[in-house]
Amino acid sequence: MKKSRITDLVGDPGHMSIEEFRENGYAAIDWLCDYFERIESYPVLSKVKPGQIKSSLPSSPPKNAEQFSQIIEDLDEIILPGITHWQAPGFFGYFPANASPPSILAEIFSAGLGVQGMLWLTSPSCTELEILVLDWIVEMMGLPDMFKSSGFGGGVIQDSASSAVLCAVIAARELTKTKAAPQGTQSYLIGYCSEEAHSSVEKAFAIAGLGRENLRKISSDSDGALLYSNLEEQIASDLFNGLKPFFICGTVGSTSTLSCDPIKKIGRLADLNDCWLHVDSAMAGTAAVCPEFRYLNDGIELADSYCFNPHKWMLTNFDCNCFYVKDKKTLISALSVLPEYLRNPRALDQPVVDFRDWQIPLGRRFRALKLWFVIRSYGVDGIREYLRGHVKIANKFASWVEAENDFELTSYTGLNLVCFRIEGDNARNEKLLNTINETGSIFLSHTIIDGRFSLRLCVGQVRVSEQTVLQAWEVIKTCASGIET
């Protein structure tokens, strides 16, 4: 019997031929290269109004196929004006979302291979490369060996630190339920974090069914670090009232100022009260690749889980979070659901890792590929040089601020985030921020420190240099000179 071609069965949907794909692929790379070359000519912060992009596009999908060249033309003329240019050297506002050339190219391979790595069986290379690369990172960053795959612990790539803390909360919840007497409700389980902790901790408690009111936000000191004595008192109070402390999130590098909680002291308290300790080092963690910044790891050996984001500062494009646990069996037990159609026959022959049991979704992308490309393309020494360069530039910027009479530092931890303000009230500083961002040449954000409106400048872009930061400083001073006191 003659075999039918797919086009005989479903018709030809208009696939590109291999040659068309090759030609269009070259065009796409050329477009990106041109974009990077001219990126400084665009306003860093998009100038479009809400709804402008949507109203510029057809309200209904095209009935017939369109040429790739037409799609690229619309990308240039309609989409690009609505882009805030995260890869621009003048983007200083938020923590960066690095997109280095090796990581971009790795994403092309990942998309082309089209891997769905939920099980070892569905792509052995996807699983085993992830295990290897995460072990590499333990070594690169001087993390505790308990996080290596060869022991009871291990690592997994999540999409973000938000997913990592959710997994940690669920694992802690389930572990506590197996130890505690049945209560019939989860309302007695109490968690703790600093008031400077990321908002994802509160969201995790809501999603996990624990309730936001069950998360105690502990006040911070003048440096933004959790006040240990207040945490100790709150735990004692909750125990006295018949509640069960079960989870503490420590922050190493807060979103607002890069402040760090006293992890070692918190870890001892967590152990004393049988609490799961999760350490969130989403931004600052990458700095530990440099031995001189390993103080950031102090106390992590006491953690049950730890995470950081290579997509922020390790030259790896979004999304990529490295999430480590001390005991992988606890995490798997909390998240595993095994219907018959997901049984892995290879697991009967010898143990294999099925990363679907380490995360919330079933499906998963081949994220390890871009980490592998980045680490091999730059080497550990290259990544260290990159990080040290950013810290050196941030140090210089902080010194410029300190030397200027009308300006003052409001927070600087010695890494790559500088918080500062000009003399005057909050309204004057807010006006300065708006004036700076309206220039289009740079983009800053703000935070409130001890009630004072402060501007944030984060040095972390792939294409940033001392010269671009010096130019930014000149823009800031020029704008400040026009703001009345």
Model regions: which residues?
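Active-site C-terminal subdomain of aminotransferase-like
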Residues: 298-402
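Conserved PLP-binding catalytic core of the aspartate aminotransferase-like
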Residues: 408-436
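Conserved PLP cofactor-binding pocket of PLP-dependent enzymes
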Residues: 412, 417, 439-456
